Amino acid sequence: MSFRYLTTFLAVSIGFLASAKTVIVCPSCEINSIKTAVEKADSFDRIQISEGIYNEFDITINKPLELVGIDRPTIDVQSKGYGIIIKSNNVSISGLRIIHIGTSYTKDFAAIYITKSKYFVVENTELENVFFGVLVEKSHKGTIANNHISSDAVVEAGSGNGVHMWHSSHIEVKENLLHNLRDGIYFEFVTNSTITNNLSHHNLRYGLHFMFSNENEYHYNTFRNNGAGVAVMFSKKIIMTHNTFTKNWGSASYGLLLK
Protein backbone atom coordinates (compact mmCIF):
# COMPACT_ATOMS: atom_id res chain seq x y z
CA MET A 1 0.00 0.00 0.00
CA SER A 2 1.47 3.36 -0.99
CA PHE A 3 1.85 6.19 1.51
CA ARG A 4 -0.93 8.12 -0.24
CA TYR A 5 -3.37 5.20 0.02
CA LEU A 6 -2.30 4.49 3.60
CA THR A 7 -2.91 8.12 4.60
CA THR A 8 -6.36 8.08 3.02
CA PHE A 9 -7.22 4.76 4.70
CA LEU A 10 -6.17 6.06 8.12
CA ALA A 11 -8.08 9.30 7.69
CA VAL A 12 -11.29 7.49 6.75
CA SER A 13 -10.87 4.97 9.60
CA ILE A 14 -10.25 7.69 12.19
CA GLY A 15 -13.32 9.54 10.94
CA PHE A 16 -15.48 6.45 11.40
CA LEU A 17 -14.08 5.73 14.87
CA ALA A 18 -14.63 9.30 16.01
CA SER A 19 -18.35 8.97 15.30
CA ALA A 20 -18.73 5.41 16.63
CA LYS A 21 -21.12 4.75 19.51
CA THR A 22 -21.63 1.97 22.05
CA VAL A 23 -24.81 -0.11 21.86
CA ILE A 24 -25.70 -1.80 25.16
CA VAL A 25 -27.38 -5.22 25.24
CA CYS A 26 -28.69 -6.87 28.40
CA PRO A 27 -31.66 -9.12 29.28
CA SER A 28 -33.57 -6.22 30.88
CA CYS A 29 -32.44 -3.45 28.50
CA GLU A 30 -34.45 -1.84 25.72
CA ILE A 31 -32.21 -3.83 23.38
CA ASN A 32 -32.21 -7.37 24.77
CA SER A 33 -31.21 -9.24 21.62
CA ILE A 34 -27.76 -9.37 20.05
CA LYS A 35 -29.34 -9.67 16.60
CA THR A 36 -31.31 -6.49 17.20
CA ALA A 37 -28.20 -4.68 18.39
CA VAL A 38 -26.31 -5.69 15.25
CA GLU A 39 -29.17 -4.47 13.07
CA LYS A 40 -29.37 -1.10 14.85
CA ALA A 41 -25.63 -0.49 15.02
CA ASP A 42 -23.75 1.59 12.48
CA SER A 43 -20.41 0.63 11.00
CA PHE A 44 -17.55 0.64 13.52
CA ASP A 45 -19.89 0.79 16.53
CA ARG A 46 -19.13 -1.19 19.67
CA ILE A 47 -21.79 -3.62 20.91
CA GLN A 48 -21.41 -4.26 24.63
CA ILE A 49 -23.18 -7.44 25.74
CA SER A 50 -23.88 -7.78 29.44
CA GLU A 51 -23.95 -10.98 31.48
CA GLY A 52 -26.89 -13.26 30.78
CA ILE A 53 -28.11 -16.06 28.52
CA TYR A 54 -29.13 -15.16 24.97
CA ASN A 55 -30.98 -17.89 23.06
CA GLU A 56 -29.98 -16.83 19.57
CA PHE A 57 -28.45 -18.29 16.42
CA ASP A 58 -27.26 -17.12 12.98
CA ILE A 59 -26.27 -13.68 14.30
CA THR A 60 -25.02 -12.24 11.01
CA ILE A 61 -22.57 -9.34 10.88
CA ASN A 62 -22.42 -7.52 7.54
CA LYS A 63 -20.56 -4.37 8.65
CA PRO A 64 -17.46 -3.49 10.68
CA LEU A 65 -18.33 -3.95 14.36
CA GLU A 66 -16.81 -4.76 17.73
CA LEU A 67 -18.73 -7.23 19.92
CA VAL A 68 -17.55 -7.29 23.52
CA GLY A 69 -18.90 -9.52 26.26
CA ILE A 70 -18.96 -8.22 29.84
CA ASP A 71 -18.77 -10.89 32.57
CA ARG A 72 -18.93 -13.70 29.98
CA PRO A 73 -22.47 -13.57 28.52
CA THR A 74 -23.64 -16.86 26.98
CA ILE A 75 -25.10 -17.34 23.51
CA ASP A 76 -27.02 -20.62 23.55
CA VAL A 77 -27.47 -21.69 19.93
CA GLN A 78 -29.66 -24.66 20.98
CA SER A 79 -28.43 -26.72 18.00
CA LYS A 80 -30.36 -24.50 15.57
CA GLY A 81 -27.53 -23.34 13.29
CA TYR A 82 -24.46 -21.13 13.53
CA GLY A 83 -23.66 -18.90 16.47
CA ILE A 84 -22.15 -15.79 14.85
CA ILE A 85 -21.62 -15.36 11.10
CA ILE A 86 -19.07 -12.74 10.02
CA LYS A 87 -19.36 -11.46 6.44
CA SER A 88 -17.57 -8.11 6.78
CA ASN A 89 -14.07 -6.77 7.16
CA ASN A 90 -12.93 -5.26 10.46
CA VAL A 91 -14.98 -7.34 12.90
CA SER A 92 -13.81 -8.10 16.44
CA ILE A 93 -15.38 -10.64 18.82
CA SER A 94 -14.25 -10.98 22.44
CA GLY A 95 -15.43 -12.06 25.87
CA LEU A 96 -18.32 -14.29 24.75
CA ARG A 97 -19.35 -17.83 25.61
CA ILE A 98 -21.09 -19.70 22.79
CA ILE A 99 -22.57 -23.14 23.43
CA HIS A 100 -24.54 -26.01 21.86
CA ILE A 101 -23.64 -26.06 18.18
CA GLY A 102 -25.52 -28.99 16.69
CA THR A 103 -23.99 -31.70 14.53
CA SER A 104 -24.93 -31.71 10.85
CA TYR A 105 -23.98 -34.00 7.97
CA THR A 106 -24.84 -31.37 5.33
CA LYS A 107 -23.54 -28.10 6.85
CA ASP A 108 -20.44 -27.20 8.84
CA PHE A 109 -22.20 -25.43 11.69
CA ALA A 110 -19.78 -23.42 13.81
CA ALA A 111 -19.87 -21.25 16.90
CA ILE A 112 -18.19 -18.50 14.84
CA TYR A 113 -18.22 -18.68 11.03
CA ILE A 114 -16.03 -16.18 9.14
CA THR A 115 -16.35 -15.90 5.36
CA LYS A 116 -14.74 -13.49 2.88
CA SER A 117 -13.47 -11.24 5.67
CA LYS A 118 -10.25 -9.33 6.32
CA TYR A 119 -8.84 -7.86 9.53
CA PHE A 120 -10.94 -9.95 11.92
CA VAL A 121 -10.20 -10.80 15.55
CA VAL A 122 -11.67 -13.60 17.69
CA GLU A 123 -10.22 -13.57 21.18
CA ASN A 124 -10.96 -14.52 24.76
CA THR A 125 -14.04 -16.59 23.92
CA GLU A 126 -15.29 -19.89 25.32
CA LEU A 127 -16.82 -22.14 22.67
CA GLU A 128 -18.35 -25.27 24.21
CA ASN A 129 -20.23 -28.30 22.87
CA VAL A 130 -19.33 -27.25 19.36
CA PHE A 131 -19.48 -29.04 16.03
CA PHE A 132 -16.92 -26.62 14.59
CA GLY A 133 -15.47 -23.92 16.81
CA VAL A 134 -14.10 -21.14 14.57
CA LEU A 135 -14.63 -21.86 10.86
CA VAL A 136 -12.76 -19.53 8.48
CA GLU A 137 -13.30 -19.55 4.71
CA LYS A 138 -11.71 -17.33 2.04
CA SER A 139 -10.57 -14.84 4.67
CA HIS A 140 -7.28 -13.06 5.30
CA LYS A 141 -5.25 -11.09 7.82
CA GLY A 142 -6.99 -12.19 11.00
CA THR A 143 -6.21 -13.28 14.56
CA ILE A 144 -7.66 -16.13 16.63
CA ALA A 145 -6.21 -15.85 20.12
CA ASN A 146 -6.71 -16.95 23.72
CA ASN A 147 -9.87 -18.97 23.11
CA HIS A 148 -11.05 -22.16 24.84
CA ILE A 149 -12.69 -24.45 22.29
CA SER A 150 -14.10 -27.85 23.27
CA SER A 151 -16.60 -30.53 22.40
CA ASP A 152 -17.41 -34.11 23.34
CA ALA A 153 -16.38 -35.84 20.10
CA VAL A 154 -16.76 -39.62 20.08
CA VAL A 155 -16.42 -40.61 16.40
CA GLU A 156 -14.72 -38.71 13.56
CA ALA A 157 -17.76 -38.78 11.26
CA GLY A 158 -19.93 -36.91 13.74
CA SER A 159 -17.42 -34.32 14.91
CA GLY A 160 -15.72 -31.18 13.65
CA ASN A 161 -12.55 -29.19 14.24
CA GLY A 162 -11.71 -26.50 16.77
CA VAL A 163 -10.15 -23.98 14.39
CA HIS A 164 -10.86 -24.90 10.77
CA MET A 165 -9.47 -22.80 7.92
CA TRP A 166 -10.00 -23.13 4.18
CA HIS A 167 -8.56 -21.05 1.32
CA SER A 168 -7.29 -18.37 3.69
CA SER A 169 -4.00 -16.59 4.38
CA HIS A 170 -2.06 -14.47 6.85
CA ILE A 171 -3.92 -15.76 9.92
CA GLU A 172 -2.39 -15.87 13.39
CA VAL A 173 -3.61 -18.67 15.69
CA LYS A 174 -2.12 -18.30 19.15
CA GLU A 175 -2.59 -19.19 22.81
CA ASN A 176 -5.73 -21.27 22.31
CA LEU A 177 -6.84 -24.34 24.28
CA LEU A 178 -8.51 -26.96 22.07
CA HIS A 179 -9.72 -30.40 23.15
CA ASN A 180 -12.16 -33.26 22.59
CA LEU A 181 -12.64 -32.38 18.93
CA ARG A 182 -11.86 -34.19 15.68
CA ASP A 183 -8.79 -32.05 14.88
CA GLY A 184 -7.72 -29.27 17.19
CA ILE A 185 -6.55 -27.05 14.31
CA TYR A 186 -7.09 -27.82 10.61
CA PHE A 187 -5.61 -25.94 7.63
CA GLU A 188 -6.65 -26.66 4.03
CA PHE A 189 -5.30 -24.46 1.22
CA VAL A 190 -4.00 -22.00 3.81
CA THR A 191 -0.80 -19.98 3.31
CA ASN A 192 1.48 -17.59 5.20
CA SER A 193 -0.07 -18.25 8.60
CA THR A 194 1.40 -18.90 12.05
CA ILE A 195 0.37 -21.18 14.91
CA THR A 196 2.03 -20.45 18.26
CA ASN A 197 1.65 -21.32 21.95
CA ASN A 198 -1.48 -23.43 21.59
CA LEU A 199 -2.38 -26.50 23.67
CA SER A 200 -4.25 -29.10 21.62
CA HIS A 201 -5.12 -32.30 23.48
CA HIS A 202 -7.44 -35.32 23.59
CA ASN A 203 -8.61 -34.87 20.00
CA LEU A 204 -9.79 -37.90 18.04
CA ARG A 205 -7.53 -37.43 15.04
CA TYR A 206 -4.80 -34.75 15.00
CA GLY A 207 -3.77 -31.94 17.29
CA LEU A 208 -2.83 -29.96 14.15
CA HIS A 209 -3.51 -30.96 10.55
CA PHE A 210 -2.18 -29.38 7.33
CA MET A 211 -3.64 -30.29 3.92
CA PHE A 212 -2.37 -28.60 0.73
CA SER A 213 -1.18 -25.67 2.84
CA ASN A 214 2.18 -24.08 2.01
CA GLU A 215 4.49 -21.59 3.70
CA ASN A 216 3.11 -21.80 7.21
CA GLU A 217 4.84 -21.96 10.60
CA TYR A 218 4.09 -23.49 13.97
CA HIS A 219 6.15 -22.91 17.11
CA TYR A 220 5.97 -23.50 20.89
CA ASN A 221 2.78 -25.57 20.77
CA THR A 222 1.93 -28.64 22.84
CA PHE A 223 0.14 -31.64 21.31
CA ARG A 224 -0.90 -34.19 23.90
CA ASN A 225 -3.10 -37.30 23.94
CA ASN A 226 -4.28 -36.96 20.35
CA GLY A 227 -4.58 -39.69 17.73
CA ALA A 228 -1.42 -38.08 16.33
CA GLY A 229 0.22 -34.84 17.33
CA VAL A 230 0.60 -33.16 13.93
CA ALA A 231 -0.08 -34.29 10.35
CA VAL A 232 1.61 -32.41 7.49
CA MET A 233 0.06 -33.72 4.28
CA PHE A 234 0.77 -32.57 0.72
CA SER A 235 2.13 -29.29 2.08
CA LYS A 236 5.41 -27.47 1.39
CA LYS A 237 7.65 -25.05 3.25
CA ILE A 238 6.28 -25.71 6.73
CA ILE A 239 8.58 -24.38 9.46
CA MET A 240 8.22 -26.19 12.79
CA THR A 241 10.27 -25.45 15.92
CA HIS A 242 10.07 -25.81 19.71
CA ASN A 243 6.89 -27.91 19.77
CA THR A 244 6.10 -30.61 22.33
CA PHE A 245 4.54 -33.96 21.38
CA THR A 246 3.50 -36.26 24.20
CA LYS A 247 1.28 -39.31 24.80
CA ASN A 248 -0.28 -39.32 21.33
CA TRP A 249 -1.83 -42.74 20.87
CA GLY A 250 -2.80 -43.48 17.23
CA SER A 251 -2.19 -46.95 15.81
CA ALA A 252 -0.51 -45.67 12.61
CA SER A 253 1.29 -42.55 13.84
CA TYR A 254 2.20 -40.82 17.07
CA GLY A 255 3.97 -37.49 17.27
CA LEU A 256 4.49 -36.19 13.72
CA LEU A 257 3.08 -37.58 10.47
CA LEU A 258 4.61 -36.38 7.18
CA LYS A 259 2.97 -37.34 3.91
Show which residues each predicted segment covers:
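Per-repeat structural element of leucine-rich repeats
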Residues: 33, 56, 207, 217, ...
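Extracellular beta-strand-rich solenoid/capping regions of secreted or surface-exposed proteins
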Residues: 40-43, 54-66, 75-119, 132-139, ...
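Acidic Gly/Asp/Thr-rich repetitive segments characteristic of extracellular carbohydrate-active
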Residues: 20-55
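Parallel beta-helix/beta-solenoid
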Residues: 42, 62-63, 70, 87-89, ...
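Extracellular beta-strand/beta-solenoid scaffold signature
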Residues: 77-85, 105-114, 129-132, 136, ...
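Bacterial N-terminal signal peptides that target proteins for export
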Residues: 1-7
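N-terminal signal peptide c-region/cleavage motif recognized by signal peptidases
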Residues: 15-17
